[in-house]
């Protein structure tokens, strides 16, 4: 995608998604989805453009309740019609790596569903917990 095409179509990163925001990840996914929805030609090229130290993170705290809630919100932002189906497919496909003794598949799916619905009603994980 060319920069001028992005500007012409007024595609921007979502301010609610990404490190330091209400929903801790997914800004890149939503950005690319928006480019495709606008009909822009998106391609990938397998070049290494950066090296990132993955040993510590200021926002990723593991596969905890917020992770699954935010994952549901991401899929809610991606698609009203197919978002929940896609979310369930991703959770099922990655069930061996995402779930552990602390959070079961069933619990993670329930949290993701809450995030999916919560996003539609502007309820973040923090607001949800404040109301409980």
Locate the predicted segments by residue:
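Conserved nucleotide-sugar donor-binding
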Residues: 1-12
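Catalytic beta-strand/loop signature of glycosyltransferases that borders the donor
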Residues: 13-15, 39-51, 63-64
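Acidic donor-binding loop at a coil-to-helix junction in glycosyltransferase catalytic cores
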Residues: 16-30
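Hydrophobic residues within well-ordered alpha-helices
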Residues: 34-36
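Short Asp/Glu-rich motifs
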Residues: 54-55
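Intrinsically disordered, low-complexity segments enriched in Gly and acidic/Ser/Thr residues
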Residues: 58-60
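Non-catalytic, C-terminal membrane-associated alpha-helical segments of glycosyltransferases
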Residues: 62-132
